[in-house]
Amino acid sequence: MTKGEIYMRTLLLMTALFFCGICFGTDFPAIHTVRGELDKMSGHLQGACASQDAFYFGHQKGIFKLTRDGKIIKHVSAPPHSGDVCYYKGKVYSAVAYYDKARLGKGCINEYDADLNLLRTYELEVSTDGITVLNDKIYFGAGPTQQKLHRGNRIGVIPVDFKGKPEFFDIDHGYPTHFGVQCIATDGKLLFMSFYCHEYGVGVFTPDLKPVGVIKFTSSIGFGDFPQNKTADTVFFRVRQKYNYKKKEKPYFIITFHKYRNGKMINLSSKENKK
């Protein structure tokens, strides 16, 4: 073997090890929000999304914009029940299910710019939760909303420019759940829908809403795709709330990163630093 061949093999090995390190999580440490930073939150976290430089957390009465290290940049109020959020081409979309008596059972989709200035509201005749954008189409949860355990849900689809009327599709995610879809994410090819179900949690669908499979991955309060340029594969993130009732600690949130591989979500933040 020549020196040139040895050099090329060594270079290829180092490159492979570098990308393996990225793929298996050494570059995606868990992120913690500051204790008490989100005390203004109403109820529990409803959904989350990320841009190239910020996170967005949706709660029942508003949306937070946070830095990548979990500190608040801005908060805006929104009508209850404000639900899941998604980020697409510089804009934030929020699914809303109205809770007031006059509009109970109806909802809307709010469109914001990246600084959370409201651009427009698209009114709907159904309550909504769970939202993402794929191929310039908004996918949103459209019921049912009952707490009683049931199987099957309904998804609405509308162009991201809101031209035309929404289409509705009945789906079977393969397992019983409470309420409708809670959070939706995408890797640019498939849809990942999170439901209230501790046994499975996430149903995977094609863009035409054909079922692909289910994942045992609880992520009903915050789940999204994470924009980054380090790998060709999509990285997802999950948000969980952490607190200790006995110690009367103020809650904080932990963001971990995951990759979809062989029908499973692989944890890329295996070393979750304690706070």
Predicted regions and their residues:
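Loop/turn-rich, solvent-exposed surfaces of beta-rich toroidal or solenoidal domains
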Residues: H173-F205
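Beta-strand-rich domains and repeat architectures in extracellular enzymes and scaffolds
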Residues: R35-K61, H81-D84
